[in-house]
């Protein structure tokens, strides 16, 4: 058995770097177009969901061929800086477990041949959630203005806070069987063999992203985005395993034994039956 339980939390004030500022920078560097990020089919376009969610929840917007975060101001040379002090928080929670259940049976044939049978089941669960929060210590430092092509201000607001959350979950079940035989054909001599069937594990993965950005002021508004429900189902099969052994006892002097185990890892198989892209 195993467990994967963990809670992490961090908080602090920062006036030099911003989570959504980095998101905007990476989206600019990757060359994602605003029309692609804002499309109703953006989550199926191959663009990482993080940037789609961030853009559609107004965490960053295009400006002079780059993206600028709601927490940033822009110099004349198109370089960006954090506009003021931010109260930043990060949280992560993981949980999960792995268990193996086995049913055993044994047979004895005249104290000469012994047979053991195991029927087993593996189960696993895992979930991962993390969030990033940024809140303006003073919203007046974070003026956001949108202008038309003539330079006229068409919208004026102040960044107040944002939250980005990502969730992932996995569950799986696998089945296997083992059989072992030990035989004592004559005194002092013992032979044995074990066989484990391939383990076929069915695994289901799901994930989801969501974002929210709050603006205050004259044209203040709350923008939010929620990704579709991503899902991937796949099957993982491990190879058959077998082992053989023989031993002979030389009275009170010692024992001679030989063992051999075989397993062809080239027979491992992975097959996906449903897949929704997310990188």
Where are these regions (language model features)?
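Outer-membrane beta-barrel porins/channels
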Residues: 2-279
């Amino acid at each position: 058995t195993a467990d994967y339980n963990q809670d992490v939390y961090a908080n602090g004030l920062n006036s030099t770097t911003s989570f959504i500022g980095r998101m905007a920078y990476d989206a600019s560097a990757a060359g994602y177009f605003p029309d692609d990020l804002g499309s109703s089919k953006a989550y199926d376009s191959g663009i990482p969901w993080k940037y789609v969610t961030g853009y559609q929840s107004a965490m960053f917007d295009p400006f002079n061929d780059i993206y600028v975060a709601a927490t940033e101001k822009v110099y004349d040379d198109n370089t960006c800086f954090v506009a003021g002090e931010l109260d930043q928080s990060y949280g992560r929670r993981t949980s999960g477990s792995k268990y193996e259940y086995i049913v055993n049976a044994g047979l004895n044939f005249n104290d000469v041949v012994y047979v053991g049978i195991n029927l087993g089941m593996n189960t696993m669960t895992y979930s991962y959630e993390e969030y990033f929060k940024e809140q303006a210590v003073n919203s007046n430092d974070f003026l956001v203005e949108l202008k038309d092509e003539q330079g006229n201000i068409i919208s004026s607001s102040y960044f107040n806070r944002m939250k980005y959350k990502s969730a992932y979950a996995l569950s799986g079940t696998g089945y296997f069987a083992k059989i072992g035989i030990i035989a004592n054909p004559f005194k002092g001599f013992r032979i044995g063999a074990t066989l484990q069937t391939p383990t076929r594990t069915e695994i289901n993965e799901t994930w989801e992203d969501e974002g929210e950005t709050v603006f205050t002021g004259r044209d203040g508004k709350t923008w939010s985005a929620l990704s579709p429900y991503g899902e991937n189902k796949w099957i993982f099969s491990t190879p058959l395993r077998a082992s053989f052994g023989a031993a002979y006892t030389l009275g009170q002097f010692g024992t001679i034994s030989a063992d051999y185990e075989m397993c062809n890892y080239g027979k491992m198989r992975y097959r996906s039956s449903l897949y929704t892209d997310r990188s």
